[in-house]
């Protein structure tokens, strides 16, 4: 929705200004996503707070990026795919092969069986709007994940979807 106003500190609604000022102070710039989310101060707060929670969940940073890349790719947000690919690459969170597999939505091409199961489960969550089959859930658990992490995948998909749709 890039047709919406991309706010600056000067143009942001009063309720969004403290958050947008903090982003500017911490990053030295205001990403377009933040500027657009400032149109709805509650959406900006949601993004920032859920983002903190998502980053602190029990999935590894690499696993979080698998969820984010797959969600962005599924939602056809090239900007988000590129951003999460760059983050995963720069921080060495995933192998080159795993990044390639996530970007291609090719769960079977991961070089790590557990990440492959995560990718398959994330794709199922998105395709079935959370109503995964018993077999899909069992495969996720059999790969070493647990109920908490199943819900964390859904949280990651929700966060990614907000970003993907706003971008």
Label the model's feature ranges.
Residues 121-125, 135-144, 148-150:
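Amphipathic alpha-helical interface segments
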Residues 104-112:
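Acidic/His metal-coordination segments adjacent to aromatic residues that form catalytic metal sites
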Residues 67-71, 113-132, 156-157:
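Amphipathic, charged-and-aliphatic alpha-helical interface segments
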Residues 32-35, 61-77, 106, 147, ...:
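Alpha-helical scaffold segments that form or flank carboxylate-/histidine-based iron centers
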Residues 1-61:
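Mobile cap/lid helix-loop segments that border enzyme active or cofactor-binding sites
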Residues 147-167:
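Preference for long, well-ordered alpha-helical segments
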Residues 24-25, 41-46, 76-81, 126-135:
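Short acidic alpha-helix initiation/capping motifs at coil-to-helix transition points
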Residues 42-44, 81-99:
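Iron-sulfur (Fe-S) cluster-binding segments and ferredoxin-like electron-carrier domains
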